[in-house]
Amino acid sequence: RVDYSLARLAHYTATDPVHFQNHILFTNYGFYMDEFVNFALDALKDTNSGYTSFVASGNHITTLENLVLTKTNKQPQMPTYHLTRADGSGITLVNIGVGPSNAKTATDHIAVMRPHAWLMLGHCAGLRNSQSLGDYVLAHAYLREDSVLDEDLPVWIPVPALAEIQITLEDAVAQITKLKGYALKKIMRTGTVASVDNRNWELREHTGPVQRLSQSRAIALDMESATIAANGFRFRVPYGTLLCVSDKPLHGELKLPGMASEFYRTQVTSHLKIGIKAMEALREMPLERLHSRKLRSFDETAFL
């Protein structure tokens, strides 16, 4: 099982598994990858950062002594960057692409390396009219309509929010946005995220989907977050989700080309910085606290 997953990771990411770090960020947009490169190069220049190298797909390694970025000509299915530290406590960013099948594939295989945490940084449809484009959604529950894990983890099994992750993400949002109190709550809502397996869900007759979304009290919808959280629960990997509202299809605000490019340009940097800030905070957390007891069964021996 382990050998198979390591071989799959090398295939999908075009990087050797040895480069994977203990803190994993998932996204599905190339914009985040580009911004991560900029952050990584700046981090390498900072001799106090603790980061030692930047590894891109194709196993191209950049260090402080050789700050020449080399990119592979042929991108793999899941482009992956690693900002490494000597003890493996750096950050890996994986572009999983779109859909729950990709999310399951990535997390199935990364789980064998027993990372200390993984977070989803993606975009979502805001379901409440009071939300604005660019607002953040911190998931504290999931409506699982992604289908891909139903046989491995039945949908009747709750996927709990992990306080250690939730508090860290909220603190990171506050630090990066420099907001607090009501101003912070206004741009970051906590609630249920629905994940579906139909990218064009909004084209269907709305009676069924809208009723289920309303009954679940969902505030956002995407295609990957519930899968990543459910597989984190399944494999005992601490998980979390921070999404950014990119459209509101139920309220007439669709993701159109011009609006999307403006949105991405203004939001990507701060969203990624929040994810990185959260991971750096989790790195300082004692492992016995980070690896929550919520991830263990009553008859399981606690282990890291």
Regions found by a protein language model. Name each.
Residues T63-L304:
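Glycine-rich phosphate- or other oxyanion-binding loops that anchor nucleotides, phosphorylated ligands
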Residues R1-V98:
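N-terminal short beta-loop-beta anion/metal-coordinating cradle
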